[in-house]
């Protein structure tokens, strides 16, 4: 038995302007090469574009988009005997949000277009409406989990 104590889970900090943890999680995932100020710029421009397009609270659109993309279940590769099975596992809320943010950024980077702020705002609006590549990725993951339900007992 380990003598080392358990560590407390870190709480996500909130961003300086909106005081929102989701925005901060998004900033930390979009971050490249340590340029956090550029990441903040991209996010804030995307939020401003959402505000201009919808004329509603952009944070509610962001929450709705992330809620729509968050998966309930995913598959994990598990080696049993000599073969590898895709085992469906339930996902917690924090891990689900992290996956949703990762998929939203992946989908927005994949989009053709001018700059990242424009692409991210478009993807967030699509996800809030229930369409877009990030939503498709979630549905594909759910389909994979449903197809491999027979291996659920390998958890």
Curated annotation (Swiss-Prot):
Keyword presence, Ribosomal protein: yes
Job of this protein: One of the primary rRNA binding proteins, it binds directly to 16S rRNA where it nucleates assembly of the head domain of the 30S subunit.
Gene Ontology CC entries for this record: chloroplast; small ribosomal subunit
GO molecular function, one term: structural constituent of ribosome
The keyword Chloroplast is assigned to this record: yes
Cellular localization per UniProt: Plastid, Chloroplast
Keyword annotations of the record: Chloroplast, Plastid, Ribonucleoprotein, Ribosomal protein, RNA-binding, rRNA-binding
HAMAP family, A to Z: Ribosomal_uS7_B (MF_00480_B)
Matching Pfam families: Ribosomal_S7 (PF00177)
Subunit organization: Part of the 30S ribosomal subunit.
TM segment ranges: none
NCBIfam families, sorted: rpsG_bact
Gene3D superfamilies found in the cross-reference section: Ribosomal protein S7 domain
Protein name: Small ribosomal subunit protein uS7c
UniProt GO BP: translation
Family according to the record: Belongs to the universal ribosomal protein uS7 family.
